[in-house]
C-alpha cells in the first residue's frame, strides 16, 4: 500500500501541478472532485464517472450517516465497495450541512446537536464522532470538523468561530486513526480577515495535517473578495501540502484559484447544471432548453469525447430535456463532468508548459 504523499512536478508563478499518492491510487493536481453526496454522483454510473477522467470523488458525511448509516456501509465493506469506486474518496466532515440546518441545530463547545431533516431524530456531531464516521466509511481523505463562518461576519464573530474550529481541529486530529495511504485535512477559517486567516493557518499547522482546506469562501462574498483572500492565504500555507478550496466550481473561479496556488476543488455545479439542461463548453454555457436548439444538428462540442457529443446532436438533447426524459440529464451530466475534467487536464498541461491558462469564457 502506498504512503500518502504530495509531489509537485511543475510550477508556473503560484500555480502548481503534481500528484497526490494515496492508498486508493494517484490524484493528478490541480484536480476537480465530482460530488457523490449520498454515495452516488447523480445521474451517473460509477464506471461512467471513471470515463470522464475523474481521479477522486467527494462523499457527504452528513447524508451518509443518516442514510444508510456509516455502520451499515462499514458492514457492507466500506464506501468504496458499496458504490463500486476503487479510486480515492474525500469525505467532508458533515459540518457544512449541519450548520445550514439553522433552526434544527445548536452549536456548543462539544459539537453540533441537530435533528435529522428526514425523521427528526436527534444527533450530536462532535469532532470525534465525525472522524469516526469517516473512518467507518473508509474515506481516503478525512476532513476535520469545522464551523463554517457565515458571511458577512464581524471581526469578533469570525474570531470566535475560527477559535472554535481550531479547538475542534485539535480534537479531530487526536481522533484520527493513522493508516498508510490515508490522510486528514484541517480547514482554515477566518472569514475575509487577513489577520484571522493567518492565525488560523499558524494554529492548524501545529497539528501537522496532511493537507489544508480553505473554508468559509464562496458563501456570498463574491469573486473579487474571494481571490483577495486566496492571494494571501496561499502565502501562509505550507508549500509541501495539498490545498483544497471547498465548494468552488465555476470554471473562472477554478482558474483564478489555481493561479493562486490551489490544488483541489469540488462543486455540485456540473451535475446540478446538467440536470437543469445547462451545458458547459469551451465557448461558454449552453441552455439546451432554448428553442433555438430544436433543429440544431451540431453536437455540444465537436472535440469532446463524451457520449452526448460523439453520438447525439443539440436537437436531440433539447428534445430529451424538454420532454423530461431521464436520458437527458444523464447525457448532460456526463458532458459537464467531462468538460470539467478536460478543463483540469488543460490547466495541468499549461502549468507544465509554463503558459498562462486564462482560457475560460
UniProtKB/Swiss-Prot annotation:
Binding site for substrate: 92-96, 146, 189, 216
Catalyzed reaction equations: 7-aminomethyl-7-carbaguanine + guanosine(34) in tRNA = 7-aminomethyl-7-carbaguanosine(34) in tRNA + guanine
Cofactor(s) annotated in UniProt: Zn(2+)
Keywords recorded for this protein, A-Z: Glycosyltransferase, Metal-binding, Queuosine biosynthesis, Transferase, tRNA processing, Zinc
Keyword Methyltransferase: no
NCBIfam families, A to Z: Q_tRNA_tgt, tgt_general
Similarity comment text for this entry: Belongs to the queuine tRNA-ribosyltransferase family.
Physiological role: Catalyzes the base-exchange of a guanine (G) residue with the queuine precursor 7-aminomethyl-7-deazaguanine (PreQ1) at position 34 (anticodon wobble position) in tRNAs with GU(N) anticodons (tRNA-Asp, -Asn, -His and -Tyr). Catalysis occurs through a double-displacement mechanism. The nucleophile active site attacks the C1' of nucleotide 34 to detach the guanine base from the RNA, forming a covalent enzyme-RNA intermediate. The proton acceptor active site deprotonates the incoming PreQ1, allowing a nucleophilic attack on the C1' of the ribose to form the product.
The protein, known as: Queuine tRNA-ribosyltransferase
Organism ancestry: Bacteria, Pseudomonadati, Pseudomonadota, Alphaproteobacteria, Rickettsiales
Amino acid at each position: 500500500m502506498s504512503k500518502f504523499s504530495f509531489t509537485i512536478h511543475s510550477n508556473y508563478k503560484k500555480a502548481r501541478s503534481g500528484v497526490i499518492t494515496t492508498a486508493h491510487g494517484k490524484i493528478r493536481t490541480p484536480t476537480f472532485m465530482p460530488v457523490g453526496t449520498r454515495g452516488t454522483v447523480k445521474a451517473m454510473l460509477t464506471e461512467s464517472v471513471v470515463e470522464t477522467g475523474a481521479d477522486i470523488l467527494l462523499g457527504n458525511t452528513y447524508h451518509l450517516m443518516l442514510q444508510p448509516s456509516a455502520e451499515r456501509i462499514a458492514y457492507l465493506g466500506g464506501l468504496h465497495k458499496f458504490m463500486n469506486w476503487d479510486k480515492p474518496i474525500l469525505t467532508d466532515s458533515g459540518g457544512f450541512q449541519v450548520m445550514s440546518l439553522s433552526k434544527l441545530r445548536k452549536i456548543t463547545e462539544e459539537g453540533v446537536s441537530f435533528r435529522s431533516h428526514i425523521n427528526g431524530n436527534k444527533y450530536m456531531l462532535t469532532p470525534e464522532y465525525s472522524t469516526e464516521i469517516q473512518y467507518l466509511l473508509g474515506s481516503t481523505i478525512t476532513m476535520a470538523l469545522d464551523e463554517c463562518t457565515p458571511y458577512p461576519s464581524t471581526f469578533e464573530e469570525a474570531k470566535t468561530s475560527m477559535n472554535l474550529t481550531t479547538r475542534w481541529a485539535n480534537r479531530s486530529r487526536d481522533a484520527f486513526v493513522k493508516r498508510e495511504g490515508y490522510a486528514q485535512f484541517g480547514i482554515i477559517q477566518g472569514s475575509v480577515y487577513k489577520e484571522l486567516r493567518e492565525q488560523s493557518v499558524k494554529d492548524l499547522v501545529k497539528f501537522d495535517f496532511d493537507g489544508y482546506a480553505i473554508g468559509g469562501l464562496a458563501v456570498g462574498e463574491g469573486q473579487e473578495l474571494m481571490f483577495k483572500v486566496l492571494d494571501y492565504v496561499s502565502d501562509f500555507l505550507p508549500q509541501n501540502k495539498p490545498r483544497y478550496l471547498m465548494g468552488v466550481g465555476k470554471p473562472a473561479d477554478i482558474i483564478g484559484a489555481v493561479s493562486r496556488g490551489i490544488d483541489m476543488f469540488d462543486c455540485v455545479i456540473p451535475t446540478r447544471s446538467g440536470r437543469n439542461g445547462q451545458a458547459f463548453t469551451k465557448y461558454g454555457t449552453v441552455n439546451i432548453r432554448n428553442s433555438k436548439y430544436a433543429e440544431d444538428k451540431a453536437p455540444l462540442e465537436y472535440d469532446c469525447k463524451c457520449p452526448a457529443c460523439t453520438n447525439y446532436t443539440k436537437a436531440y438533447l433539447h428534445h430529451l430535456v424538454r420532454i423530461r426524459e431521464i436520458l437527458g440529464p444523464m447525457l448532460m451530466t456526463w458532458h459537464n463532468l467531462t468538460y470539467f475534467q478536460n478543463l483540469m487536464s488543460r490547466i495541468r498541461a499549461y502549468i507544465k508548459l509554463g503558459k498562462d491558462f486564462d482560457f475560460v469564457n
